[in-house]
Swiss-Prot record:
The protein's name: Protein PLANT CADMIUM RESISTANCE 4
Species of provenance: Arabidopsis thaliana
Species lineage: Eukaryota, Viridiplantae, Streptophyta, Embryophyta, Tracheophyta
Alphabetical UniProt keywords: Membrane, Transmembrane, Transmembrane helix
Subcellular location: Membrane
GO CC, any one term: membrane
Length: 184
């Protein structure tokens, strides 16, 4: 039937589509809050991927108190674990930790550690917040490492078992069929 006063086959106007807006910095802001870069020639977004947020704040170190203590006493261990997962096994934990330890004694560990934060951000679409990676690591080195460790755990990785252990843990367990008999 329909609404009173309306005709059964009355044509409905098409829904209004809101086009994303492009600001002066060539960033596209869509209705759902996604931010991407605009193609200057066409004005269309090149990468309309939404930007994810960090799963925890920079100063939430005690959300994982065991990692906070380890990072406080031996940040090279945490950095090694992060490096192995972020680089998908290309940088073993021991190598990443040893390099970090050597650079730590020179007094500029943030130079090495901020690279892995940048890789993680690019890989998972995380914002460069609360400050650029190098500033975050320069002034809040231990907190930044803890946040990155927690982020990997939040995304389903266990940094303690390394890249190979995580790959193996994600493989489906196959069990042999039971109760098969020959028909004959």
């Amino acid at each position: 039937m329909g609404r009173p006063g309306s005709q059964p086959n009355e044509a409905q106007p098409p829904p209004v589509q809101v086009q994303p807006t492009v600001n002066r910095d060539n960033q596209v802001h869509s209705q759902n809050g996604a931010i991407g870069q605009a193609n200057i020639q066409t004005g269309r977004p090149v990468n309309n991927q939404t930007q994810n947020l960090w799963s925890s704040d920079l100063f939430d170190c005690m959300n994982d108190s065991e990692n906070a203590v380890i990072t406080c006493l031996a940040p090279c261990v945490t950095l090694g674990q992060i490096a192995e997962i972020v680089d998908e096994g290309a940088t073993p934990c021991a190598t990443g930790g040893l390099l970090y330890g050597m650079i730590f004694f020179i007094g500029v560990p943030f130079v090495y550690s901020c690279m892995f934060r940048a890789k993680m951000r690019n890989k998972y679409g995380l914002p460069d917040a609360p400050a650029p990676d190098w500033i975050t690591h320069l002034f809040c080195e231990h907190c930044a490492l803890c946040q990155e460790y927690r982020e990997l755990k939040h995304r389903g990785f266990d940094p303690n078992i390394g890249w190979a252990g995580n790959v193996q843990a994600q493989q489906p367990v196959m069990s042999p069929p039971t109760g098969q008999r020959m028909m004959g």
